[in-house]
């Protein structure tokens, strides 16, 4: 039986991440090789980005993807999010030279309030929203608070890039295959304060913590490497990590939509108060996905080091969310 096309809205569609993302969505890598998609693409209403978006759409046409059932270009979120089943909020304002963090939060606050309101007004009531644009956790919080008629659980932030970076570092350290690393998670904010936690992780069924058995490596090498990886890539490439971010967005949405087959993955979700994280803070947690829903992994013990790291990333998130509360 042929499936009915689903509508996938992508913001910042002509940007670097958008360019790395759209072809993979259209080829079926995100929602399955049997699921047709209609792309609803949003860019800012300036001539340059709209022209660039038109060029990207020409290329999408030229791929003749069997699953691409249609696409439209937009400058208004009310049109771009109409009946959207999935929304990937990639576009955000990057921090410019000399820009204060408070200024950055305010500029992005305005963007994500407008997008949250538009989703609230016109998207599918089951829309799955992934915020990629930074600061991702706080932008997801803003969009969620601006969409009171949609369930809180529909809004997520992308921690999967940190998760994948951590998996890759662990695989390299232990000499194991990345596919064999399981039960790793990343707690907190998508920022250098995130806490990548391999205490429960296994590689080929063996304990990763026992294999590595080096707390100094954990604190002084592993965590800084994962936390500062984005900056290291900008330093090396002269541009931010776009392809790996797009790949993480595909992974996040695919697992949410199609299931993670019992594997732990990391998603930024609105807290219900578990693990001592105050309600509604959008925080990286370990989850499993099945039947289009995510389920928090409950009951993990947190040692003193983990508590300290989680409190530090929580404090940063609370400061960010306090910084935008006056906008909401």
UniProtKB/Swiss-Prot annotation:
Record-linked Gene3D superfamilies: Lactate dehydrogenase/glycoside hydrolase, family 4, C-terminal, NAD(P)-binding Rossmann-like Domain
Keyword DNA-binding listed: no
An example Gene Ontology molecular-function term: L-malate dehydrogenase (NAD+) activity
Enzyme Commission number: 1.1.1.37
Superkingdom per UniProt: Bacteria
Any single biological process term in GO: malate metabolic process
Database matches in SUPFAM superfamilies: LDH C-terminal domain-like, NAD(P)-binding Rossmann-fold domains
HAMAP family to which the protein is assigned, alphabetical: Malate_dehydrog_2 (MF_01517)
Name the UniProt record assigns to this protein: Malate dehydrogenase
Lineage: Bacteria, Pseudomonadati, Pseudomonadota, Betaproteobacteria, Burkholderiales
Gene coding for it: mdh
């Amino acid at each position: 039986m042929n499936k009915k096309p689903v509508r996938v809205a992508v913001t910042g569609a002509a940007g670097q991440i958008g360019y790395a993302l759209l072809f993979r969505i259209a080829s079926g890598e995100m929602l399955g090789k049997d699921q047709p998609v209609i792309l609803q693409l949003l860019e800012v209403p300036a001539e340059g980005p709209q022209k660039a978006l038109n060029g990207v759409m020409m290329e999408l046409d030229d791929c003749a993807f069997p699953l691409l059932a249609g696409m439209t270009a937009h400058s208004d979120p009310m049109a771009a999010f109409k009946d959207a089943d999935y929304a990937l909020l990639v576009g955000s304002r990057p921090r410019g030279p000399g820009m204060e963090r408070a200024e950055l939060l305010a500029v992005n606050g305005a963007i994500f309030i407008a997008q949250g309101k538009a989703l609230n007004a016109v998207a599918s009531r089951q829309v799955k929203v992934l915020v990629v644009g930074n600061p991702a956790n706080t932008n997801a919080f803003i969009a969620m608070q601006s969409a009171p008629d949609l369930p809180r659980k529909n809004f997520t932030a992308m921690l999967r890039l940190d998760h994948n970076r951590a998996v890759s570092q662990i695989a390299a350290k232990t000499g194991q295959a990345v596919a064999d690393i399981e039960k790793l998670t990343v707690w907190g904010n998508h920022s250098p304060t995130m806490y990548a936690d391999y205490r429960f992780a296994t590689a080929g069924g063996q304990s990763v913590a026992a294999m590595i058995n080096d707390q100094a490596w954990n604190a002084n090498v592993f965590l800084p490497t994962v936390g500062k990886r984005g900056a290291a890539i900008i330093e090396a490439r002269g541009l931010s990590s776009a392809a790996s971010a797009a790949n993480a967005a595909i992974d996040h949405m695919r697992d949410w939509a199609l299931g993670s087959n019992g594997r732990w993955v990391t998603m930024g979700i609105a807290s219900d108060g578990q693990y001592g994280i105050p309600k509604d803070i959008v925080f990286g947690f370990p989850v499993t996905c099945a039947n289009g829903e995510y389920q928090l992994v409950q009951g993990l013990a947190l040692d003193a080091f983990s508590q300290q790291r989680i409190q530090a990333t929580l404090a940063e998130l609370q400061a960010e969310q306090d910084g935008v509360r006056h906008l909401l």
